[in-house]
Design a protein with these regions (language model features):
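Short, glycine-/aromatic-enriched active-site segment of Class I SAM-dependent methyltransferases
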Residues: 161-181
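Class I SAM-dependent methyltransferase SAM/SAH-binding core
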Residues: 59-61, 65-115
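Conserved Class I S-adenosyl-L-methionine
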Residues: 205-266
Length: 266
C-alpha cells in the first residue's frame, strides 16, 4: 500500500509562497489558490450558470483556501459564505479576505458538508461546490441540504471528478486517493441523487478533457520547481504528489475516469 501524501493541507498552508503561486499560474493561467480540476474557462462560466448579480447571496461548499470566493466578491460584489472542513483552508481563506479588503462581503467557516448546516431554509440565491462532493461520504445528505438552503429561484452548480468510465486497477485507485476520503461514482448515480433530493437537473456536462489537461500542466509545473518544492514539502511527499498527478492524467486521458459539471435548480 502506498503511503498517503499531503495534497491539500500543504497547498493551503503554503498558499502565499511564490513557488506554489508560480505552479498555479502555469497550471491554470491565473492564480487564486486553486487545488481543483476547474479550468479557467469553467471558473469564468460558473457565475453565469449561477446567474450571479451584486445582490446575490452565495454559498461555497468546500471553499478550500478561499481564492475563488474572494474573486467572486471582488468581480461581482456578491456576498459569499464559504465553508471548509480543513482548518488550514479556513484560516488561509479568512486571511485572504482581509488582505483583499472584501471581509465585509466574504466570510469563511469550518463545517462538515455532510452534517446539518447551521443556515436558514431558502437563504442562498446560489450554491456551488467544485470537486468536493467526491470526498464526502453522505452525498445524499449534502444534496438534500443544498435543496433546503437554496431559494426557490436559485441555482446550484457542482462537479464530480471521480465518475467511473472504464476498468481501473486497485493500484490505480489507490494512487488516485492520496489523502482523506474519496468516493467513486458509477455513471448515473449523481443524476439519481439529484432527483431524489428534490433538485432539478438542468445540465450534466462532460469536462474530463479539462481534467486531463490540468493534471499534465500541474505535474510539469511542479517538476520544473522540484528542488524548491522538496524544500517545502519533503522529497517523499513531492514524489507522491507527482505520482498522483501522473495517474490522474493517465486515467482521464484514457477516459477511464471521468469528470462532470452539473447545473441544477430547485
Amino acid at each position: 500500500m502506498n503511503k498517503k501524501i499531503d495534497l491539500y493541507s500543504s497547498s493551503y498552508s503554503n498558499y502565499s509562497l511564490e513557488t506554489y503561486s508560480e505552479v498555479r499560474l502555469e497550471t491554470y493561467g491565473e492564480d487564486y489558490g486553486q487545488t481543483s480540476w476547474v479550468s479557467t474557462e469553467e471558473s469564468h462560466e460558473i457565475p453565469e450558470l449561477l446567474q450571479l448579480t451584486s445582490d446575490s447571496s452565495v454559498l461555497d461548499i468546500g471553499c478550500g483556501s478561499g481564492g475563488y470566493a474572494v474573486g467572486l466578491a471582488k468581480r461581482i460584489g456578491c456576498r459569499v459564505l464559504g465553508f471548509e472542513i480543513n482548518e488550514s483552508g479556513v484560516k488561509t481563506a479568512n486571511a485572504l479576505a482581509e488582505d483583499e479588503k472584501v471581509s465585509d462581503l466574504v466570510k469563511f467557516e469550518q463545517h462538515d458538508a455532510s452534517e446539518e448546516l447551521p443556515y436558514e431554509d431558502d437563504s442562498f440565491d446560489a450554491i456551488y461546490s467544485t470537486d468536493v462532493l467526491c470526498h464526502v461520504p453522505r452525498r445524499r445528505e449534502v444534496l438534500s441540504n443544498t435543496q433546503r438552503l437554496l431559494n426557490p429561484d436559485g441555482k446550484f452548480v457542482f462537479s464530480d471528478a471521480l465518475v467511473i468510465g472504464g476498468l481501473i486497477s486497485y493500484e490505480e485507485l489507490e494512487n488516485r486517493c492520496p489523502d482523506g476520503l474519496y468516493f467513486f461514482s458509477p455513471p448515473g448515480i449523481n443524476e439519481q441523487l439529484i432527483q431524489e433530493s428534490g433538485l432539478k437537473l438542468l445540465e450534466a456536462r462532460d469536462t474530463t478533457a479539462n481534467c486531463a489537461l490540468l493534471s499534465k500542466r500541474w505535474h510539469d509545473a511542479r517538476e520544473k520547481r522540484k528542488e524548491a518544492l522538496i524544500a517545502c514539502e519533503g522529497e517523499e511527499n513531492f514524489l507522491g504528489v507527482q505520482r498522483f498527478l501522473a495517474g490522474v492524467h493517465r486515467l482521464t486521458s484514457e477516459r477511464r475516469l471521468l469528470r462532470f459539471l452539473y447545473t441544477c435548480s430547485k
